[in-house]
Amino acid sequence: MAQVRARLSGVTKVFESGNGRVHALGPLDLDLGAGEFVTIVGPSGCGKTTLLETLAGLTAPTDGTVSFEGKPVGDEVPAGVGVVFQEDASFPWLNVWDNIAFGLRRAGVAAAEIRARVTYAIAFMGLQAFARAYPAQLSGGMRQRVCIARTLVLQPRLILLDEPFGALDQQTRLLMGDELLRLWRETHATVLLITHAIDEAVMLADRVGVMSARPGRFIELIETGWPASRSSAIVAEEAFGKLTAHVWSRLRGESLRALGRTEAEPAGSVS
């Protein structure tokens, strides 16, 4: 692996609820190399989002340590880390240009630098025709392009994405995946993406992390072997089908366990 950019070591997360303690995550370990693209799949409720929020500094682990570029992650998103969620996070009262510039203005970046970065991000994400449009005038895919562009202008070295294309149709997801791969290649950022779509996870990743049912742990980290130049065209390759089938074979049992079922128990059976 290349130089480690982010690391989770022995991380667990326990939540207190009205019904007692909920062991949501871990213990688990994960190293993210500089310039690596890692995707994570797992059953619903296994702690995927909790893992991302822990790495981003949005929630503290109950046990274990989290670091970014060798420094402990505290209780806020570290400089150099960008986060994109599934939910539309654009500001409806700002047009596309001002949405993308928002974080730079808050950070006190000089006006000329803001213009240069926003102009580049808008061109990179294919938003030139929509720079003065408002979020309500855009499709879901275009709004996600705006959110990714808003992260891009901050020049993050680690990009964390939680189901960024979850609300999009399959064709748009594949095309957005191609855009994300292009962004990854050009910026050399480390990317961690959470998804429920196995084909998306396999297409995008250098490594696919498969998580267990709650409490979430890694049951396998799978090397894909794809070249950095990959695109959605690989979904038609035989190797892609085999790798996708392998990921599902590891995930299926955990998904059944999360539903309280076993391999031998058919759906709809009643005990």
Please report, for each region that a protein language model flagged, where it lies by residue.
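Conserved ABC transporter NBD signature motif
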Residues: 64-76
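Hydrophobic anchor residue at the start of the ABC signature
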Residues: 148
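Short coil-to-helix segment of the ABC ATPase nucleotide-binding domain corresponding to the Q-loop/switch region
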Residues: 94-102
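Conserved signature/switch motifs of ABC ATPase nucleotide-binding domains
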Residues: 133-136, 154
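Helix-to-loop junction immediately C-terminal to a conserved catalytic motif
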Residues: 56
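The feature captures the beta-strand-to-loop junction immediately N-terminal to the Walker
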Residues: 41-43
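Conserved ABC ATPase "signature" region
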Residues: 105, 112-130, 182
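A short, flexible loop at the N-terminus of ABC-type nucleotide-binding domains that lies
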Residues: 2-5, 14-27
